[in-house]
Amino acid sequence: MKVIGFNHVTIRVSDLQQSLGFYREILGMDLIHQGRRDVYLEWGTAWVCLMEKKGERRDDMAGLGVDHVAFTIAEEDFDEAVEKLREHRVTILRGPMERGGGRVINFLDPDGVQLELYTGSLEERMKVWE
């Protein structure tokens, strides 16, 4: 499997509007999509998703921070990549499935970090929301 590039990182936040202000006003990211509980920002060639995780108990807030890191791979490499993950008995969380204009699979690395392989582009994903 050949990784074409970094696709995006999703960060779970406690207050979407506060975080959106920080990433836009302080870091200078451009807002490209705003949903009910998530936003997508662009920063040069980097793409960042902020996903709100509301919780009243302290335990509920333990999941804040990086949710997953996604890498772009070629469509023609996707099935082989999925097969390799299965052969090595990697824990698959979601997928493989069609999502946001591409094919996607989410899985865990040996330390439990969630990773994603995605065949689409930011532009293809944005078309889904138009």
Question: Where are these predicted regions, by residue range?
Answer:
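Vicinal oxygen chelate
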Residues: 6-13, 42, 60-130, ...
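Conserved short beta-strand elements that form part of the metal-binding/catalytic scaffold
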Residues: 30-63, 114-120
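Amphipathic alpha-helical segments
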Residues: 17-30
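N-terminal beta-strand motif that seeds the catalytic metal site of vicinal oxygen chelate
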Residues: 1-17, 69, 121-130
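Short secondary-structure junctions
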Residues: 28-33, 92-95
